[in-house]
Amino acid sequence: TKDYMAHQYVQQPNAIAANRIKRDFFNVRSDGTVYGLEPNYGCCTANMHQGFPKFTENLCYKTDEGFCFMVYSPCSISTLFKGVRVILNESTDYPFKNKSKIVVESVSGNPEIKFSFRVPQYTSLEVLVNGKKVVSGDKGIIAFKKKVEAGDVIELLFDMPLTTVVNPDKSISFRKGTL
């Protein structure tokens, strides 16, 4: 809920119940799937505020050669790169949609910048610059170098196939990309 008075300690894909019952979890009490302020243990309430700044500070790293995008989320980056002010804006609905767009909003001169991208697990990634494919890959980090100009558009296209997963209890889950 918006006031954080109802969350689950243990979330299960395709869960059909949120109740107090003995389960086969080795380290979770019987109320672990129940919604509340502090179900099972109070760590969520105590630590919830830490996630947002940690998530934000790990979206993109500046390197000696350019920028490395590690996590995909709407953001704006304004920094000096080799003495040149660079402003990048990312817009995306990833992982719910398969696209992300990074626009070079402002840059002085025409510096060569290396752009690196982490390929999320269970996906492959294709990168287009101004509509032309420049690199693709299905694991690790993929990268390209370009002399950038204001207005350049970098598009990330994530291929996220739908797969089925058989769980240890023989139930089946569906996975689409990282979801």
Go through each PLM region and give its residues.
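Aromatic (Trp/Tyr) and acidic
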Residues: T1-V119
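Short, hydrophobic/aromatic-enriched beta-strand segments in well-ordered soluble domains
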Residues: V119, G151-L162
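Solvent-exposed beta-strand/loop surfaces of large extracellular or lumenal domains
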Residues: Y122-K147, T164-N167
